[in-house]
Amino acid sequence: MSRKTRLLELMMKRETLRLRQKADALCGLVGDQTRLSDLDEKLADLILENSKNHGSQTVSALRSQAFYGREMAEKREFAQNRLEFLGREIVTAQTQLAQSKQKEKMIEERASQERRLLAQDALDLADRLRPAQKIER
């Protein structure tokens, strides 16, 4: 194996590791997005339930309901902002993953081409070193 072939093989392994890391990061982002969207749905249900009229209430119950309504609305707004951010991050991570896959493919093609050239050079050298045979008629 030539030095260039070995370097290309090492580059390919390094790129494969990077690809794996980027894929793991993408899976983490998607998992976060799923959990956060579930939380957003639960908060929406709680806000809807809290906003229903429960008949006559005391002043402290109304204050409590208003306080919890504001708190849930703030949490939901935070969750929605985070979901929007995660959406952008997922798109970025997918783009980087695709670029990394393309780079790995290019390095793999260069390594296989180098291996073919090395094998062809070895065959050519063997043909040159082989003694000439006489053809009898």
Regions found by a protein language model. Name each.
Residues 1-137:
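Charge-rich amphipathic alpha-helical interaction elements
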